[in-house]
Design a protein with these regions (language model features):
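Hydrophobic transmembrane alpha-helix segments characteristic of membrane transport
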Residues: 104-134
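Juxtamembrane transition segments at transmembrane-helix termini in multipass membrane proteins
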Residues: 2-12, 21, 58-73, 110-122, ...
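Interfacial aromatic "cap" segments that immediately flank transmembrane helices
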Residues: 11-46, 126-151, 163-211, 248
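Interfacial loop/helix-cap signal at membrane boundaries in integral membrane proteins
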Residues: 70-87
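Short acidic/polar alpha-helix capping motifs at helix-coil junctions
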Residues: 73-78, 92, 132-133, 235-237
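Polar helix-capping/helix-linker motif
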Residues: 31, 83-84, 245
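Hydrophobic alpha-helical transmembrane segments in multi-pass membrane proteins
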Residues: 36-59, 86-103, 138-161, 198-227, ...
């Protein structure tokens, strides 16, 4: 069987087959994924870098102020909290912006996966910036609604796993609304919980291990800034060069940009897990017809 047939979407696969097909597509079409998504991935990286730099520099001040007030005065002054309210609001807004930017960037990837599901191939994007607005919007809506639905299920985390299948099904089938997809697809996803668990567990493990390496420079600078700021607040000299803050920001941009592409197997393997479940459903329906 040639490689193109091996990475077709709707084909019954074991969890190993899903991971293998996902990795083949990830490697063979990486240039296409990169060309289609680099702009949105860069926007996400810039927002994430701003968040990382802000938290490394400003959040220690808030923590130390609260700790000192609790120790000395057995209470927290409202005035001190109000003075840092702007920082907290900025962090919250940056987190929301990062989530939205990531969802929009995912939309560019799902647009290519949608093309692959229909044609069995992914064409090279004609330009460096040619986004699919409809797919971006659908992905943003789907990921935000999935996040909303998954919050109550975090108490019983295993029940949240089929939502990944529901999300991919919703994005790949534009004719169906999210809530209708959730009603019809959640039970089917639960029926394949074991294979979904293995696919996502191994994929997340790969991302965690790779991400530790990719994000290591940013994490080192984050901790260095954090400890330096904590030291200043208790009377120590800063001991950091003046270029440390811009260097931290630039490092976060580069690491976040690379980390976005490290995380792509999560989307691609989920895409193939969805295709395998759909293929099994069609196979079961065909068997039922043959028995009649």
């Amino acid at each position: 069987m040639d490689q193109k047939n091996n990475i077709l979407l709707q084909k019954v696969r074991s969890y190993r087959g899903v991971l293998s097909a996902g990795m083949q597509l990830y490697i063979s079409a990486f240039r296409r994924f990169f060309k289609a998504s680099w702009m949105t991935a860069l926007i996400y990286a810039l927002i994430n870098a701003a968040l990382g730099t802000l938290t490394a520099i400003k959040v220690p001040e808030l923590i130390v102020v609260i700790q000192l007030q609790l120790q000395r005065f057995n209470g927290i002054f409202i005035e001190s909290l109000q003075s840092y309210l702007v920082v907290l609001v900025e962090c919250i807004l940056l987190i929301l912006a990062a989530v939205i930017a990531m969802a929009v960037a995912h939309g560019t990837i799902y647009a290519l996966l949608k093309e692959h599901s229909e044609t069995g191939d992914i064409s090279m994007p004609g330009s460096w910036w040619k986004p699919s607005r409809s797919m971006m919007g659908r992905t943003l809506k789907g990921e935000l609604l999935t996040l909303l639905v998954s919050i109550p299920l975090l108490i019983v985390a295993p029940f949240a796993l089929p939502l990944w299948y529901v999300l991919t099904k919703y994005i790949m089938e534009p004719s169906t609304g999210y809530w209708a997809t959730l009603r019809k697809g959640y039970g089917r996803g639960m029926g394949h919980w074991g294979s979904l668990f293995l696919v996502y567990f191994l994929t997340v493990l790969f991302i965690l291990l790779s991400g530790m390496i990719v994000m290591l420079p940013a994490n080192i600078l984050f901790l260095a800034n954090y400890r330096a700021q904590m030291g200043v607040l208790i009377g120590d000299p800063l001991g950091m060069p003046s270029y440390m803050i811009p260097m931290t920001f630039i490092t976060f941009v580069l690491c976040s940009f690379l980390y976005f592409y490290v995380c792509l197997p999560l989307l691609i393997n989920g895409y193939y897990a969805y295709g395998s479940i759909e293929a099994k459903k069609l196979e079961h329906e065909q068997q039922q017809l043959n028995l009649q």
